[in-house]
Amino acid sequence: DTSARQTIALTEYFLDTYNIDRSRVYAEGYSGGGETMSRVMGMRPDLYTAYLQCSSQWDGNYTEVVKARVPVYFAIGEKDEYYGSEPSRNAYNAIHKLYEQEGLSNSEIDRLLVLDIKPTSYFSSEGISNQHGYGGYLFVRDKNIMGWLFGQIKK
């Protein structure tokens, strides 16, 4: 939790010190950074507009994210060599279930939660065979993924 608390402190410092549009504060975590950012999102989701988790697993609390209604996008390769796609699928399902319990419709949940498990062809079409190692490279260059992230605006 130390890294998560440090990330929160740094975000708060930036928000307090600089002229930042608080309706557009985005978080992204890749691999181990995704584990840390999921902990951040489980502690202080209110600091962020949306969260993109790439090639990682969720280690944080789900309920705070659901309470805050912060949009979350999971991007991972179907054959991610480090995590596999199951941890992302499990986190997606857990958050989805919490939203259902809150009474949200599927269309409302779909605006808040995305599970994007990329097939092997997504990587091989770019000449890449290592899904985990190059997932972070490809995902941040993917216009659909980044368009989703930067299209989120906090009300």
What is each model feature region?
Residues G34-P45:
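Short glycine-enriched nucleophile-adjacent loop
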Residues D46-W58:
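A conserved short beta-strand
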Residues A9-L10, S55-V65:
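Alpha-helical scaffolding within the catalytic cores
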